[in-house]
Amino acid sequence: MTSAAFDEILRRLVAAGARFVVIGGLALGARGVVRATKDIDIVVAPDPENLKLVAEVAVAAGGHVQRGEALLGTPFSIAAELASGEQMAIDTDLGRLDIVQGLEGVPSFDELLSRATEAEVLGVNVAVCSVEDLRAMKQAAGRGQDLVDLENLDAAAG
């Protein structure tokens, strides 16, 4: 997916009034590390109204989630699945939106938001996790790309 498609997902989430914090590859970009990313990683406020807003934006963008034999593609079904507190990858016509929740090493929405700063990501002003939180999440994940990201984050910080 192109950054223009990611831009549109972010615009729609902001326009809907959804509360979220950007993490992952796009957060790295906001912190001076440029690299390709295949998805938008966000942590969302877990209250039912916010989950409904996120689900509505995803479904309006052609969003669906495959869960075994079931294909979830309505705001209600996606919001209900989000309410379970599990991580969810939503494939939309604009790209993949990863809702990160309940993973070890990932702070809660409230914790992330309290340390986040507003930054421009692909031309959209959004809450972006702090460098410290980003570093901690990358260390906790510990995959090869995460270790490279840590090195690049340190280099960008000077």
Predicted features and spans:
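Compositionally biased terminal segments of proteins
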Residues: 1-158
